[in-house]
Structures are given as structure tokens and as C-alpha cells.
């Protein structure tokens, strides 16, 4: 059994099955996982169902890799995940604080009111958990990783970044500039981070 993040090259048929089938499977599952946030009014119920859906997506990915790639799932190692998640949260908060700070200095961001609702925060924290899990499985866990293992890093970065950006063109108020920005800043960056940290 190959115990690395990347398996040796598959046969073309098996690679196509994992690549196309995996993307289709998790895109559909991800769509269903967003239902609680979109259609359930109660914040606590919606948040809890979103959390359950996110965990199920992770279990599905574990099943896919174990069943068809027959390797240790290094990218979902709990020992690495807890530490890396904490570091990721810290960097994420620092970057968001920097962006908001720049916006405020430029006069583009103003606080006109302040309130705090624990249930509301819980709901959307869990909703974004589903978004993060779903997108990372599809674009990094499957698309980027399989392209990188079968071809090379540049092919994986370019294709996954373009598709990642294109998937966000349907966002409210999205523009060509914002889509290109997501492709370059997020698609490429997250691909490189996945390659470096292997998680």
C-alpha cells in the first residue's frame, strides 16, 4: 500500500473514474450539504445539520481514497489536522483583520451598528465549515491532487485555479476581475499550500 499523499500513476481508466466520478460525486454531495443553511430557519438546527453534512463529506472522501486508491489518508490525519486548523484559523483572522483595516483606512468600510447573536454566529460558522470542506475536497483533494500526481504541479495549479475561479462567477455581484482574483490569489495559493503542507 502506498502510504504517501500521492499514489503512483493510475491506469487512464481508473484515473478518469476517480477524477471525473469524484468531482461529480462531491459536487452533488456538496450541493445537498448547503440545504440546511439555505432552507432551515432555526439557527441552531441549521448549524448542527451543516456540521453533520461537513463531517459526512469528510467521511465520504476517506471512503473514496481508502476504497479506490488503497493508501493512508495523510491529508486527513487528525494529529496534523488539529494543529493545522488552529494555525489556519489564526492566519485567516490576521489576514481578514488586515483587509478590513485597509478598507477602513481607505474609507470603504464603516461600522454603523454592532450586535452579537450566538445562534446566528454558530449557524454561519457551520455553514462556512461546509463550504470550506466541500470546496477543498473537490478542488484540492480531488482535482489538484490527481492532476499533480498524473501530470505535474503547473498543470494542476493552472487547471484547478481556473475552474475554482469560474465556479465563483455565479456569486452575487461577481465580476471578471473578482473571478480572476479568486483564481490567482485563492486557487493558486491554496493549491501551493496543499502541496507544501500535504493537508
Regions found by a protein language model. Name each.
Residues 97, 132, 152-169, 183-187:
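Small-polar-interrupted transmembrane alpha-helices in polytopic inner-membrane proteins
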Residues 134-159, 192-199:
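Membrane-interface helix/loop boundary segments of multi-pass membrane proteins
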Residues 1-72:
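N-terminal, membrane-interfacial amphipathic/helix-forming hydrophobic leader that caps
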Residues 179-199:
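Functionally important transmembrane alpha-helices
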Amino acid at each position: 500500500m502506498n502510504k504517501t499523499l500521492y499514489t503512483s500513476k493510475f491506469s487512464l481508466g481508473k484515473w478518469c473514474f476517480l477524477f471525473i466520478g469524484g468531482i461529480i460525486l462531491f459536487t452533488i454531495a456538496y450541493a445537498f450539504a448547503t440545504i440546511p443553511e439555505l432552507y432551515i430557519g432555526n439557527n441552531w438546527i441549521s448549524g448542527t445539520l451543516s456540521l453533520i453534512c461537513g463531517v459526512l463529506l469528510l467521511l465520504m472522501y476517506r471512503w473514496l481514497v481508502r476504497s479506490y486508491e488503497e493508501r493512508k489518508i495523510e491529508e486527513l490525519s487528525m494529529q496534523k489536522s488539529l494543529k493545522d486548523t488552529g494555525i489556519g484559523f489564526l492566519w485567516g483572522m490576521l489576514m481578514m483583520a488586515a483587509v478590513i483595516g485597509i478598507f477602513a483606512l481607505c474609507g470603504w468600510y464603516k461600522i454603523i451598528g454592532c450586535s452579537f447573536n450566538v445562534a446566528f454566529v454558530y449557524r454561519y460558522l457551520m455553514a462556512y465549515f461546509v463550504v470550506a470542506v466541500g470546496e477543498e475536497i473537490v478542488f484540492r483533494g480531488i482535482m489538484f491532487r490527481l492532476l499533480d500526481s498524473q501530470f505535474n504541479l503547473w498543470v494542476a495549479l493552472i487547471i484547478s485555479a481556473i475552474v475554482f475561479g469560474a465556479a465563483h462567477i455565479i456569486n452575487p455581484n461577481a465580476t471578471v476581475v473578482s473571478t480572476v482574483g479568486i483564481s490567482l490569489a485563492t486557487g493558486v495559493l491554496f493549491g501551493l499550500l496543499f502541496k507544501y503542507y500535504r493537508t
